[in-house]
Amino acid sequence: MNKPNEITLSPHWEDRISNEQKLRRNDQRSVFQRDRARILHSAAFRRLQAKTQVHGPGSANDFYRTRLTHSLEVSQIGTGVVAQLKLRQPEFRALLTSTSLMESICLAHDIGHPPFGHGGEIALNYMMRDHGGFEGNGQTLRILSKLEPYTEHFGMNLARRTLLGVLKYPAFLDQVHSTERPQEVSNVRHLKSIDWHPPKGVYRDDADILNWILKPLSDVDKALFSTFRFQQESQHTHRKTRFKSIDCSIMELADDIAYGVHDLEDAIVMGIVTRNQWQESVASKLAECGDEWFEANIETISDKLFSGLQYQRKDGIGSIVNALLTSITIKPTTFNDEPEFESELLRWNAFLSPSMSYALEVLKKFVGQFVIHNSEMQRIEYKGQQIVMEIFDALNSDPERLLPENDKREWREAKESGANAHRVIADYIAGMTDGYAQRLYNQLFVPI
């Protein structure tokens, strides 16, 4: 079945975990408009302006994107996808009701990423290895539902469907972790990032939130939703969940497009990649990707990207984004011989056409090879990794002496209640900007 029957959604997807009695005179906004406002006005969102996307704040070139501008671009692409899907497949309009919902999900999707990008994530995962681990998507859910002080206990108290849209991996970290853990190091400077990339999922500390999000689903849907993509290739390979909601699938495509195309633009402007590298690794493959438009226009696009003229480069970037965005359609999430989801939010996902999915993978691989794994970028990431681990080690040595007052109180409460006190330290560090972490490191370790 490739077309839906009449779509009806449970009103419980607009519920919040805590019933609010807010003093808001004549507030006519929808649930999701209020969610968007809460995210935009949050301190956690503002901090993204000083967190690493690819090129860290303080780079010699100020053209680069930060986590904040990346999130804004993901939001722009995500709402563009929703708009074109409503026109292309009007039978799904009841499922794609709110632009504000997609904006909220896209704006919030990276809010849990720590300072120094993946270096910070690996560092916190290593330091939390015996205390539940650390992972950026799991931290995002934690900030939205518990940490951001919009409410006393429930974070931003967002609607259930918004949280479902942010939930990229609906399983606990210990369920998807490799069966064999890497060997610990005697000196953190010898830590290899490839060994300590975290699995993707939710913390056990936040089981109550995951259970609340999934409450409207049937037991059959809950079981199917948490199935894995593939069997583990080896004892050292993490597993990944297979399914996500339709809103999350749109956000994830928008995120991938922003990463594969807009981060490419940064690299071109900053001289990190050359025309020859592009031609060999990307253009030659896109010329044979199976998409007629790309095959006919890739040479012109390449000329524009490397013309040295900003307006030409922007036009080339826009052409690629548009080609990808307009190749997205809604399809069933399961194959014909598999059981279907009962919930409409899970039964359907957004997918790129096969040829354009291949094209996007080529672009992402290029950015990964020539930008992310560029030796200069890796040195910066390594430095951030060391900063985060040393800060964690110091704070954990004497939390009552070194933590700020609010975090100190939370640490004491966790200790007294038998909860995970190490999570409080990880939460504090994860919320830091790159600059704040650097200054705290200097306070702790640089001689006066």
Swiss-Prot record:
Domain HD stretches: 67-260
InterPro entries linked to this entry: dGTPase (IPR006261), dGTPase-like (IPR050135), dNTPase_2 (IPR023023), HD/PDEase_dom (IPR003607), HD_domain (IPR006674), PHydrolase_assoc_dom (IPR026875)
GO molecular function: dGTPase activity
Domain of life: Bacteria
GO biological process, one term: dGTP catabolic process
Keywords: Hydrolase
PANTHER family: DEOXYGUANOSINETRIPHOSPHATE TRIPHOSPHOHYDROLASE-LIKE PROTEIN 2, DEOXYNUCLEOSIDE TRIPHOSPHATE TRIPHOSPHOHYDROLASE
Family to which the UniProt record says this protein belongs: Belongs to the dGTPase family. Type 2 subfamily.
Protein name from the UniProt record: Deoxyguanosinetriphosphate triphosphohydrolase-like protein
The species this protein was found in: Aliivibrio fischeri (strain MJ11) (Vibrio fischeri)
Record lineage: Bacteria, Pseudomonadati, Pseudomonadota, Gammaproteobacteria, Vibrionales
